[in-house]
Amino acid sequence: MSVIKMTDLDLAGKRVLIRADLNVPVKEGKVTSDARIRASLPTIEAALKQGAKVMVTSHLGRPTEGEYNEEFSLLPVVNYLKEKLGAENVSLAKDYLDGVELAAGKLVVLENVRFNKGEKKDDETLSKKYAALCDIFVMDAFGTAHRAQASTHGVGKFAPVACAGPLLSAELEALGKALKSPARPMVAVVGGSKVSTKFDVLNSLVKIADTVIVGGGIANTFVAIENNVGKSLYEPDFVDAAKKLRDEYGIPVPVDSRVGTEFSETAPSTVKKVSEVQDNEEIMDFGDETALAMANLLKDAKTILWNGPVGVFEFPNFRKGTEIVANAIADSDAFSIAGGGDTLAAIDLFGIEDKISYISTGGGAFLEFVEGKVLPAVAMLEERAKQ
């Protein structure tokens, strides 16, 4: 994949606009999880260090487009950045489309792009206004690379130079390493509640990976091929498709499960064979035999791609399966890449962040890349690199 990289450019004295992913959770004006800002900081700091006049922007939440709404302001992010970079070095610009005051080595945060009408539609006029603000546009938001919007795609078409930031470059390299030429055996773990939302991902992965492990509600649909799954979350419409995948690609199906009679944090759990699940019970996690068998498959892997927990790990009584699988991934010598919100929460809970080779910041973009889809922002960068 040939794109211009920010690290290859001289940024000194240049007006640099970085599109980052600073879409973080905010409560009472404070950032409650700073993972995305931390991931973006090295890019911002590298540009400042070179003496660039730096602007950074992002979306946050889902405001009504074209209207300012304090609830979705990037101000909490600005306050966080002031703590990291010094209050005198960071400011917030609310109205910036007609130009903004910049200084070398200083950072101006441009307010939430979704306050601008035309952002989501990739409006050309808006894209040109963004482009006019900068000499170099840096796309560094992998999490929104699958959306063709004015601040992720359109701006790059019209900016004098458009390049990939270090975070985006690292994401693309890590995913490329896992999917384009994986060291074998490659094992993929796909969890989550619905087969329907991950069907394209499963279809892609069975052709790339040597083994695909399914967990969560997805696994229940596979269990339902030959068993009663009681009140479990599963998709009857996808049982035939699941059977086809199982038969054709040898997807391992759980042999035992942790079940409960109600979906609640305090519900007691019982381990039983999948063939013994009663009508009033629901499967909420792998049983021990299944979890250990899956861990065994992961032990010898050379590449692991993990998307989604294998059980309701938020409930202490239904956590063990995800914990066993997570620790097997952490203890493996494989190149491991993990992505998706719930996956990151599980990594956090079990404290294994340092043991995963690469943690992707993208949710939808991660899945679309795995499905083999073209990400509009990446396609734009490739196009610009040819010019």
Swiss-Prot record:
It comes from Erwinia tasmaniensis (strain DSM 17950 / CFBP 7177 / CIP 109463 / NCPPB 4357 / Et1/99). It is an enzyme of class 2 (transferase). It catalyses: (2R)-3-phosphoglycerate + ATP = (2R)-3-phospho-glyceroyl phosphate + ADP. This is Phosphoglycerate kinase. The lineage of its organism: Bacteria, Pseudomonadati, Pseudomonadota, Gammaproteobacteria, Enterobacterales. It comes from the Bacteria. Monomer. ATP binds at residues 198, 314, 340-343. Pathway: Carbohydrate degradation; glycolysis; pyruvate from D-glyceraldehyde 3-phosphate: step 2/5. One of its GO terms (molecular function) is ADP binding. Keywords: ATP-binding, Cytoplasm, Glycolysis, Kinase, Nucleotide-binding, Transferase.
